[in-house]
């Protein structure tokens, strides 16, 4: 039996990540990696702006109900993203300025919050 219930959000998430990547690339950021997963957290996008490394969380909502994508990031999710980024920085021996951005997509609107947390 196929469980499409869990597949639909993943497809939306992947579409949102692709939109976010293109949006940021159009604004001069350089793509490094996507969907970096560790057992304790995931990084949706990693990009660079010059020498600065940017770890990006992408939130996509097809409707703006319940606060929309801008309000969809929990403190627990922020903690998991930070742990994943710290691990990525250590294993890749990155010695540079880093920041955490949020891309929130509600239907067709994209909101970019640099240094979101």
Swiss-Prot record:
GO molecular function: nucleic acid binding
Entries under Pfam families matching the protein: UPF0102
InterPro entries on file: Restrct_endonuc-II-like, tRNA_endonuc-like_dom_sf, UPF0102_YraN-like
Top-level division of the source organism's lineage: Bacteria
Family to which the UniProt record says this protein belongs: Belongs to the UPF0102 family.
Name of the protein described by the UniProt record: UPF0102 protein Swoo_0351
